[in-house]
Amino acid sequence: MLSPSENTALLVMDVQPAALDRISDKDAYLTRVRATVEAARRKAVPIRFVVVGFRPGMPEVSPRNQVFGAYRKQASTMLVDPRPAITPEDGDVVVTKRRVSAFTGSDLEVVLRGGDVQHLVLCGIATSGVVLSTVREAADKDYRLTVLSDLCADPDPEVHRVLLEKVFVRQAAVIASEQWVQSLG
């Protein structure tokens, strides 16, 4: 059996200014995410920031896309600057995606396979968006999965609860970030 940090990567997904504006108590959320990222770095767990981003004018987005199409209509610059809210450090990798799942429209899988990653530890905004889509796709790709319950956030508290308590547990270990950090030793 793998140790908690062996062949593991921490995916910090869509923790960007535009996404943070959609959740309550974003300062406390960011504090928890930063603490977990720092603990992972101390234990040499690779950090992979996944951000959503597009070229100016958003040519990657079809007018039929219900998630991102509204931003395109508004000629939004919000998603054209895909900086994570937590500053990456040397050794961290920032992956830009162009759809909801962290895998779709990105080179995430190439980056993970290049590092022989077999276990993904997931957190991000929104639970009903990037976290749900990534859990499903990663499970189909046979990754071992852990979802950090207190580092997932969603504008809809009931959807968040149902996903964590009833949906994700079918394909992932769902634990608090503190428990995962303690498991690193």
Which ranges hold each PLM region?
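A cross-domain feature marking catalytic cores of carbohydrate-active enzymes
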Residues: 15, 49-52, 149
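Acidic-leg catalytic submotif of subtilisin-like serine proteases
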Residues: 9-16
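Aromatic- and acidic-residue-enriched segments that line the glycan-binding/catalytic groove
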Residues: 59-71
